[in-house]
From Swiss-Prot:
GO cellular component, one term: cell surface
One Gene Ontology term of the molecular function aspect: glucan endo-1,3-beta-D-glucosidase activity
Similarity comment: Belongs to the glycosyl hydrolase 17 family.
Protein's name in the database: Probable beta-glucosidase btgE
Annotated catalytic residues: E443 (proton donor), E538 (nucleophile)
Chain residue ranges for the region called Disordered: 61-94, 116-166
Keyword Repeat set for record: no
Location of this chain's protein in the cell: Secreted, Cell wall
Organism for this UniProt entry: Aspergillus oryzae (strain ATCC 42149 / RIB 40)
Keywords: Carbohydrate metabolism, Cell wall, Cellulose degradation, Glycosidase, Hydrolase, Polysaccharide degradation, Secreted, Signal
Length: 602
């Protein structure tokens, strides 16, 4: 939990070096049960619209790629000429390069490329999820062929076309017209650019003038291997009083500026929809463009009350009363307004599902605790291991409350071999749409449970296992600053983002009101270790115990320290911890049991 301050003292006058001998940690390993994994049983009757990413390989020189809509089925008709439905899922034209095109659609799409078309500055775009083009050796003179694709029973619908451009240039997206005869709800698509930090976007807002129950469709993403499926669920949501509510938004953390694509529910009514030809000038790589349909009947979102898509917001400035409904797989829940917290900037809270005696919390208690974390203004909950059905219970609560999870593989005194069971449990659980980060080890090097090179190898092994089960997010470990400074050369290549536990209390020259500036200085020092972004995975201040020089524990002191931490580094920090851990040993300065701080957030 605590980090030695071995870098040059910055931002805190008179800061002394922390005593590395005072690094005996919180004793997370003193109670870790490994319970049998219990898979979730999906609820019957869930409505869903599956919009599956299809991968189509094209061979040809750099050119403009027209994407045509397939011929309609009897329930709809198209006024534009469309290619015949072939019998294979890839369209191949032999040429001098191979590029992969990802296209998200509700119908089979045939992609035709004309060799020799000159497009100034244009490169072949990839549709759907951003992908990396693959190079190949020259294949000789181009010769067109049209492989067959299995016929599909789905009718083309005017869902927005999502295209990701991996290179700069000028691109043309051809016009398409579709006539729809039947009303249906589908997965639309929207893009937004997120700067570095934690953001909330998507979902559906509803404004009610009195207590009421809202039933509406919400869209979500469920990854499985290399396929990402957008699904629509019907949600029943209880608005307890008049106000503005957000139903099923998405909250995520991005280390750098990123363009994200997320699904939105859209009701397609009978009518003619036109997607005009679009010329797109791409000035940056990994650029994503959504080409919408327009027409006599525009797709609309959310059917009950006054609803609309939710714009992107950051946790620094929440402007609406936000509440999240559970999917139709669970009973409807009663929502409460989400307060702004200390200053509305705190990212995450650690949570361990243990009782004061060291037993496992009941499912009802876990659901209640996680709901309170959301109400206090947090966007993430950090879980250390798979103990006490933590993934299942906390995962269910996180989904109901619109929280994201930072999950962990805990390495104890049994070493790396003893942690493998948790890796297996996580890959079976595989609720990856909830997860933004996996932390392999919590101060495992600091505690002497492994060495840096062995940990780096285990991180890489875990990452491969997680990716094979559908995870595409970041993986890291977390250690105090002194370990990173000593072992960064071995660890940096294995992690996607540098994770650190930064506790100002363990520096004897830091007062509570200096906690934020002290940790900010440590983060700046850590950024130079791997030249990667840094996330503070544990930080806080004890509410009881004995003083460590100027670092004095106490309720008032904890409040001052938490306020300083939120103001300085809250958007990139996980606060330790939800409640006091009375099952632990007293530890140095008699503070190890008294880090619970959820009550400091209003």
């Amino acid at each position: 939990m605590r980090g030695a301050f071995l870098a040059a003292a910055a931002a805190v006058a008179g800061t002394a070096m922390a005593d590395v001998a005072h690094m005996r940690r919180h004793g997370h390993d003193s109670f870790h049960h490994n319970r049998a994994y219990q898979p979730e049983v999906p609820a019957e009757g869930d409505e869903n619209c599956e919009c599956t990413t299809k991968v189509i390989t094209i061979t040809g020189p750099p050119t403009l790629v027209p994407i045509n809509t397939p011929a309609p089925e009897p329930s709809s008709s198209s006024s534009s000429e469309v290619p015949s439905v072939p019998s294979s899922e890839s369209s191949v034209v032999t040429s001098e390069a191979v590029t992969t095109l990802h296209s998200t659609s509700t119908a089979t799409v045939t992609v035709v490329t004309t060799p020799g078309v000159d497009a100034t500055g244009a490169q072949t775009p990839t549709g759907g999820v951003p992908g990396t083009p693959e190079a190949s050796s020259p294949a000789g003179t181009p010769e067109a062929s049209t492989p067959a694709v299995p016929a599909t029973s789905e009718s083309p619908l005017p869902t927005p076309g999502v295209t990701s451009f991996s290179s700069t240039g000028i691109y043309t997206i051809p016009a398409t017209t579709v006539t729809v005869r039947d009303t249906t709800t589908v997965c639309g698509a929207t893009t937004t650019e997120l700067p570095s930090g934690t953001h909330t976007f998507g979902g559906v807002t509803t404004v009610v003038s009195t207590a009421t129950t809202v039933t509406c469709p919400v869209a979500t993403v469920e990854p499985s291997g290399s396929t990402v499926t957008s699904k629509i669920y019907t949600t029943t949501y209880v608005c307890p009083s008049a106000g503005t509510y957000t139903i099923a938004p998405t909250t995520t953390y991005v280390p750098t500026s990123t363009v994200v694509v997320y699904p939105t529910p859209a009701t397609i009514t009978p009518g003619t929809y036109t997607q005009d030809e679009q010329t797109v000038t791409v000035t940056r790589t990994d650029f994503t463009y959504v080409c919408p349909f327009t027409g006599n009947d525009q797709p609309t979102s959310a059917p009950v009350a006054s609803t609309s898509a939710v714009p992107v917001t950051t946790t620094a400035a929440p402007s609406t009363t936000s509440a999240v409904a559970s999917s139709s797989a669970s009973a409807s829940s009663t929502a409460t307004a989400v307060p702004t917290g200390v200053s509305g900037q705190q990212m995450g809270m650690t949570y361990s599902p243990y009782t004061n005696e060291g037993g496992c919390q009941s499912k009802d208690q876990v659901l209640k605790d996680v709901a309170l974390i959301k109400q206090k203004g947090f966007t993430h909950v950090r879980v250390y291991s798979t103990d006490c059905n933590g993934l299942e219970y906390i995962g269910e609560a996180a989904r109901e409350n619109g929280l994201k999870m930072i999950i962990g593989v805990f390495i104890s005194s049994t070493g790396i071999s003893g942690a493998q069971e948790q890796v297996t449990a996580i890959t079976k659980w595989a609720q990856w749409d909830l997860v933004t980060l996996v932390v392999v080890g919590n101060e495992a090097i600091q505690n002497g449970y492994t060495d840096a090179s062995s940990l780096a190898g285990f991180i890489s092994s875990c990452k491969s296992s997680f990716q094979a089960s559908g995870y595409s997010g970041q993986v890291t470990t977390t250690e105090p600053i002194n370990v990173w400074q000593q072992s960064g050369s071995a660890l940096c290549g294995a992690v996607d983002i540098l994770g650190a536990n930064l506790h100002p209390f363990f520096n004897a020259d830091v007062t509570p009101d200096q906690a934020g500036s002290f940790v900010r200085a440590q983060i700046k020092d850590l950024e130079a270790v791997c030249n990667k972004d840094v996330i503070n995975l544990e930080t806080g201040w004890p509410s009881a115990g004995n003083a460590n020089g100027k670092a004095v524990p106490g309720t008032a002191q904890q409040a001052a320290a938490i306020k300083a931490l939120v103001e300085e580094v809250g958007s990139q920090s996980v606060f330790f911890s939800y409640s006091n851990d009375l099952w632990k040993d007293a530890g140095e300065f008699d503070v190890e049991r008294y880090w619970g701080c959820i009550d400091q957030f209003k």
